[in-house]
Amino acid sequence: MNNAANTGTTNESNVSDAPRIEPLPSLNDDDIEKILQPNDIFTTDRTDASTTSSTAIEDIINPSLDPQSAASPVPSSSFFHDSRKPSTSTHLVRRGTPLGIYQTNLYGHNSRENTNPNSTLLSSKLLAHPPVPYGQNPDLLQHAVYRAQPSSGTTNAQPRQTTRRYQSHKSRPAFVNKLWSMLNDDSNTKLIQWAEDGKSFIVTNREEFVHQILPKYFKHSNFASFVRQLNMYGWHKVQDVKSGSIQSSSDDKWQFENENFIRGREDLLEKIIRQKGSSNNHNSPSGNGNPANGSNIPLDNAAGSNNSNNNISSSNSFFNNGHLLQGKTLRLMNEANLGDKNDVTAILGELEQIKYNQIAISKDLLRINKDNELLWQENMMARERHRTQQQALEKMFRFLTSIVPHLDPKMIMDGLGDPKVNNEKLNSANNIGLNRDNTGTIDELKSNDSFINDDRNSFTNATTNARNNMSPNNDDNSIDTASTNTTNRKKNIDENIKNNNDIINDIIFNTNLANNLSNYNSNNNAGSPIRPYKQRYLLKNRANSSTSSENPSLTPFDIESNNDRKISEIPFDDEEEEETDFRPFTSRDPNNQTSENTFDPNRFTMLSDDDLKKDSHTNDNKHNESDLFWDNVHRNIDEQDARLQNLENMVHILSPGYPNKSFNNKTSSTNTNSNMESAVNVNSPGFNLQDYLTGESNSPNSVHSVPSNGSGSTPLPMPNDNDTEHASTSVNQGENGSGLTPFLTVDDHTLNDNNTSEGSTRVSPDIKFSATENTKVSDNLPSFNDHSYSTQADTAPENAKKRFVEEIPEPAIVEIQDPTEYNDHRLPKRAKK
């Protein structure tokens, strides 16, 4: 058979969407009779023996689906003789099968109009070559025609050519309708619009289009899915020069075109169908056929177009030629071109994905840049805040240091001789009994007898060494090599005498040996929690008041006795501590310390080096272990007793703190002050003791109007203080078992009468050590027995800030704070009740 399969009317090709072959419905007898050709339709021109055994029946449309379908008239015999002549067959009127019911073009081939009627139609040739299941036959045009099924009861096959004409009023895809509505909506023109020529549309802003337009028409907001659907329905992106740039922004214009999607041509939308994948694109049509204006598809007859048996197999050569068959209803591409198209589409999709990723990365970089800037800003703000806080802390520390006393490391009689040499020698002694912990506190001192009787004592050994070195007959062997300081004193006699004199002077005038040790600690940056004070000197009277006169008698000191004799010290006044407004703290100049602490020869009488040498050489027999020591002690005590006696008398008379207190003069008749009377009430309003002592007062009771004592000694100069100072002593014989006069209890502002009742324990105040410059200030005043006590307490124990120090009875110089440097800063003192 030649081209029998190609005869008939034009068949539309939009019915190939179904994936499988469905069975044909059964036909009624009347319909079969109307359709079948008469028995003489086949002459002896061309008959095939293999087809005479059965009759092939065409695939006829079910009349129930198309009631108006009618059978075609019987053609004449000349029709078969002239089957090779091209002619248009219009004698068959067939209805197009609805989409998806009958798969006429199962493998993607359209029904082609062919006016070349062969002498035979679909005969048993189709039966001899049964169809292969869908997707398994490589012959693309083998199943392009309807298959005939055998009809029982007939011996001669009477097949006839059947063609299928499809109607054009089929439904459009939903995507096409939505896209058409989207473009014709005036509210969307800012984001999607027609091109100027009307043959394509443009998406102006992809980001806004995705978020505003797509959710209104579709169930997603994915632009990539929208582009994929456009490609499935035959749209192509119009490429421009900038489209492939990886640096293009998200606002690039996207332009798509489709030859059947034109502005104002809604009728062309029916020709837009969904394309198949790469495996089925060669079997599915890409356009809609027009039954009125069908175009013939020329086939290449080089493979044997004259032979009807080769008509079906000639489809391979048709697709291998690579022809693009275009028409109003149909557009085909060969297999190679379809593959290339899919590859290009995939590449474009990958490029779009890369572009999206690049945009996302750019946004991330911008965000990271902003975060980095914010972090730097916060860092600068934190740095500025840290700077301001540091400045505030510095101001706070300056303020705190301005309201605390001076941290001057000044000791009593500091500066006698060379302080460093004295401190080194005192520190080298291993018998003083000091225990310094990490904080630099001093625990306690040993008793006097252990201090004096200890053979390892550095002071007694130093005295012996000095005497031996000054002796005319001494030699190196006479020096005690076991002594701690012997090795250093062998070199120079004068140097040894000078050093020994310094040590003896320290013993005489210092109340406590711990003063020099604390000064040594201050020079070595050792910490000390003792409250610092400005120093001022006050001498203590050793002699009994009954024997205190112009020529006071001396009470010999028994070396072997271990009496509980206490040298009085300066107590601390709680009330004045609370009311005292210390002047602002200023850093201490270390250069002024030596001159400030240097011993004043006009104030005290000291043995010079020449005197010591002279006395040592002329009276060598008198220089035993204690002669040199006691000579100096007695000499200074004689002068200090007279001076202290005069001071005590003046204090009792001129004390402003006790205006109604009676003063009982229990002193001896040798008292030099004639103004003192027994049982006399003394009231000296407006008198300032410190002004009196310093001679700077303008009051009529000035020190210049008071006669000096008979001994010729002048009162000890005391610093000036504008506040009302009061001091009193109760001279009571027999109160002190050691023969000493009742001592003056003096703090940094007030001289108080320190009378103790019977049965009570007499306590001595703390010696006010000076803290080092670089140690922190502590308000606690540690003692040798009680190491700490807070001065901030409202009520303190009586002896909380006092301690006992066992020493030899000697005139003591006690350091008290000088109020002259902060007169203008002090608060008015309350009158003591």
UniProtKB/Swiss-Prot annotation:
Similarity section: Belongs to the HSF family.
Subunit details: Homotrimer. Homotrimerization increases the affinity of HSF1 to DNA.
Gene: HSF1
Disruption phenotype: Inviable vegetative cell population.
Residue numbers spanned by region Flexible linker: 260-280
Name of the protein: Heat shock transcription factor
Compositionally biased residues, Basic and acidic residues: 447-457, 610-626
GO cellular component, one term: nucleus
Listed GO biological process terms: cellular response to heat; negative regulation of TORC1 signaling; positive regulation of transcription by RNA polymerase II; regulation of establishment of protein localization to chromosome; regulation of transcription by RNA polymerase II; regulation of translation in response to stress; response to heat
Gene3D superfamilies (alphabetical): Winged helix-like DNA-binding domain superfamily/Winged helix DNA-binding domain
Annotated region of DNA binding: 170-259
Compositional bias (Low complexity): 69-80, 277-296, 660-675, 697-713
PROSITE patterns tied to this protein: HSF_DOMAIN
Xref: InterPro entries: HSF_DNA-bd (IPR000232), WH-like_DNA-bd_sf (IPR036388), WH_DNA-bd_sf (IPR036390)
Organism: Saccharomyces cerevisiae (strain ATCC 204508 / S288c) (Baker's yeast)
